[in-house]
UniProtKB/Swiss-Prot annotation:
Keywords: Cytoplasm, DNA replication inhibitor, DNA-binding. The keyword Transport does not apply. Negative regulator of replication initiation, which contributes to regulation of DNA replication and ensures that replication initiation occurs exactly once per chromosome per cell cycle. Binds to pairs of hemimethylated GATC sequences in the oriC region, thus preventing assembly of replication proteins and re-initiation at newly replicated origins. Repression is relieved when the region becomes fully methylated. It comes from Ferrimonas balearica (strain DSM 9799 / CCM 4581 / KCTC 23876 / PAT). It is found in: Cytoplasm. InterPro entries: Arc_rbn_hlx_hlx (IPR013321), Ribbon_hlx_hlx (IPR010985), SeqA (IPR005621), SeqA_DNA-bd_C (IPR026577), SeqA_DNA-bd_C_sf (IPR036835), SeqA_N (IPR033761). This is Negative modulator of initiation of replication. HAMAP family: SeqA. The keyword Amino-acid biosynthesis does not apply. Transmembrane segments: none annotated. NCBIfam families: PRK11187.1 (NF008389). GO terms for molecular function: DNA binding. One of its GO terms (biological process) is negative regulation of DNA-templated DNA replication initiation. Residues 87-88 are annotated as: Interaction with DNA.
Length: 180
């Protein structure tokens, strides 16, 4: 017995032509093609590798000792920040650093909202319910999600507000947010 991959449409077609319980795909195809249905001895399929079905080990995000220190000033020259991909990457990285520095106070970010927008949530679904175009992203390994569908200036304003909620001075918050 050989195994082949077929697309969903073909699979549904073959399955819809099943006439009896336990009928194999080979039997169905033989019947549909007008070929002789042969009684084949039950064979045990050999185990094959299915990379798409195997678990993928996700690489642990790079953590900066600077970000772990818990001092806002150290976020200004964090060497890991320039290595992040784009404004969204830097935005998420800084939010993750802040969560790791202040995990117990971080739920204060849930109060940050736009006039008709929800920026933070503890579930992807809540952000999508509030705005289907929110493009929710999880903040590192935290239980928090943020709407990433904002322009860079708005991301900076949101980050600045997060920093101030966590106790950062306004001028320093502006310097850190400017790095997004």
């Amino acid at each position: 017995m050989k195994y082949i991959e077929i697309d969903d449409e073909l699979y549904r077609y073959i399955a819809s032509n099943t006439q009896q319980i336990g009928e194999s795909a080979s039997d169905i195809l033989r019947r549909l093609l007008g070929l002789e249905v042969t009684a084949e001895a039950e064979s045990i399929p050999e185990r094959i590798s299915e990379p798409s079905m195997e678990g993928v080990e996700e690489a642990a995000p790079v953590r900066s000792a600077v970000a772990e220190a818990g001092v806002f000033e150290e976020l200004v020259d964090d060497e890991q920040l320039p290595r992040q991909k784009g404004a969204v990457g830097r935005f998420l990285y800084l939010l993750d650093c802040l969560y790791r520095q202040h995990p117990s106070a971080f739920d204060g970010v849930l109060a940050i909202r736009g006039r008709d927008r929800l920026y933070f949530s503890q579930s992807k679904e809540a952000l999508l319910k509030a705005s289907p175009s929110a493009n929710p992203k999880q903040i590192g390994a935290s239980p928090f999600w943020v709407s990433a569908n904002n322009n860079t200036a708005k991301k900076r304003a949101i980050l600045e507000e997060v920093l101030e909620i966590l106790g950062c001075q306004k001028a320093l918050a502006a310097r850190i947010a400017e790095q997004v």
